[in-house]
Curated annotation (Swiss-Prot):
This is Dihydroxy-acid dehydratase 1. It comes from Staphylococcus saprophyticus subsp. saprophyticus (strain ATCC 15305 / DSM 20229 / NCIMB 8711 / NCTC 7292 / S-41). The gene is ilvD1. The lineage of its organism: Bacteria, Bacillati, Bacillota, Bacilli, Bacillales. Its EC number is 4.2.1.9. Binds 1 [2Fe-2S] cluster per subunit. This cluster acts as a Lewis acid cofactor. Mg(2+) binds at D80, D122, K123, E446.
Amino acid sequence: MRSDMIKKGDQQAPARSLLHATGALDKPTDMNKPFVAICNSYIDIVPGHVHLRELADIAKEAIREAGAIPFEFDTIGVDDGIAMGHIGMRYSLPSREIIADAAETVINAHWFDGVFYIPNCDKITPGMLLASVRTNVPAIFCSGGPMKAGLSSEGKALTLSSMFEAVGAFKDGSISKDEFLDMEQNACPTCGSCSGMFTANSMNCLMEVLGLALPYNGTALAVSDQRREMIREAAFKLVDNIKNDLKPKDIVTREAIDDAFALDMAMGGSTNTVLHTLAIANEAGIDYDLTRINEIAKKTPYLSKIAPSSSYSMHDVHEAGGVPAIINELFKKEGTLHPDRITATGKTLRENNEDKEILNSDVIRHLDNPYDKQGGLSILYGNIAPKGAVIKVGGVDPSIKVFKGKAICFDSHDEAVEAIDNHDVREGHVVVIRYEGPKGGPGMPEMLAPTSSIVGRGLGKDVALITDGRFSGATRGIAVGHISPEAAAGGPIGLINDGDEITIDLTNRTLDVNVSTEELDARKQNVKPFKAKVKTGYLARYTALVTSANTGGIMQVPENLI
């Protein structure tokens, strides 16, 4: 066993003394059992994580029953909704790397035989996934699950995105103070990840099709008995995987990445999933080109439209058959998925999901009646984004295929929000927010406040927004993000001037400023070199090492320093 490194032989007697001091070993023969890390992410201020200590206790008990010894440790976590719109959002994406590095450190320092990961919210799941692939120790994931959907006192369905859009509506006088406060009190009624198809739930659904989590991981409610039974089942599966030496890199293959994007397309997932999945592919040593995503989109139908793109919540999806029903429906279209891949259950993707039927065809549609014949995400290319940009087409009004507008440019998120609040942004504008990418932000903050304000003011079909930053999964409207290269890396988004005509063509997947190449080259001569905004601490180190979004916003040490 891997853990023999710290517990076998006379030279490890001091280590064994310390292990006995933990109280985790009831008898001497426990030293002969697999040591299993529980990588938890319990934190009081994140509603998606407040219940994870209870789930970890269930996992510990089950791991012992399965014949192994559990040891729990925690990582950090950032709540994107609480961190939104201020310096906290600069730390959100960078926290993914801290989580990955911290888990790698504990796992490798203590030679665990397997790892049970308990994530839930936005950056925690991908951070742990990066660690699992990097350490390549037998692993399984069981997230904390989504919260129940909110209901206003009048019975209107609510999610966190409803609350963000309500801010714009309240400022605009469209809703009353009483309505505003009622929404605030009722939008998030229980523990769990936010109830729509936002980043957390998108990633937790993708874990099912990647094969590192059990069926229904993405949709079973945080407060449900099913979630607790899933924890127990996953613990037993993990101990089996340790015995069988089934590792993350056996599961996370190029075909698994393809299938993750296919499910993403079928569910209209968050644009952040593109960023995280590309980072995971890189960690697994898979050279994954962005153009591959569009090819997957073209053959994958959009089957389930979930909040913020509709009023349906994750619980509605669960009641309609969950991710297994969507996967099984996609099996019926040959070439969409790779059903014979091995997963952490010890079975293939097909064996996990076959015969799981759709129980409500309003929530999950059949192949012959999709929301769209193509997937809910698109990669756009053009002279603004030569290395790609991402749009959640499933969140755009279906009547919009091409949008042309005049640029109104801002070099920060805050400047854009102020302009929108002051009614400087009007119908026919394309809001350009730049120097907010991974390096420029730093940290590639989410542009949820400006997009929500635009939609909340009733301009969702009349104003577009493009940025080298990113979006919350709660974003909807004509919102193009992840523009690469970013402005701070010399990307052409930094060359756009107020009044330039911009064309967003969703049919042909293009993003262009209607300015000649010669004019853009001339403008380039006047651009001043980017200077890092943060000079000390973690964000300074992050700025120095991070790449643009087209490679997943990963931290890379320059080759000349290796």
